[in-house]
Structure formats: structure tokens, C-alpha cells
Amino acid sequence: MNEDSYINVANLIKRHLAETIGVDVDDIKDEDTFLEDLHMSPAEFSDFLASLEKFKIDPSAPDIANANCVVELIEAVSSQIVE
């Protein structure tokens, strides 16, 4: 995946996450963890992952379902798009 595609995925994930949890996209850092830093409950995180289906992202893929922080999710989604 080229750098532009990675940036597009990162922007998509961060924008959707910001909209979902009600924060400004600039407040979301790559290293933020979903449960601790972004204060998402496991149910909220699960719902967020399920909502990624509208972007044709498979939320049940192991790398996506097991992501603990924003950058892990971005990398997992990026690798899924390449496959």
C-alpha cells in the first residue's frame, strides 16, 4: 500500500471514530487506546468495529477485532485493503 492510501485509511478511521465517540478528529492520536485513552467500553468498541462494514471493512478479521489502539486498527484495515 502506498503512503497516500495509508493516509486515506487513517483519515477515514479517525473521522469515523471521532464522529462515533463525539470528539474532534484532531484529538485522536495514533497511539490512543480505545478503552483507556478514548474511554470506549468493550460494547462501544464492538459497535464501532461493526459500523466499519459500511466502508466494506470486515470487522471480524483477527487483526481488526484485536486492535488495541488507533494505529493498530489503521494498519489492520490497510493490510485488509491490500489483500
Give the positions of each predicted feature.
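Phosphopantetheine-dependent thiolation modules in NRPS/PKS and related acyl-activating systems
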Residues: N2-L49, K54-E83
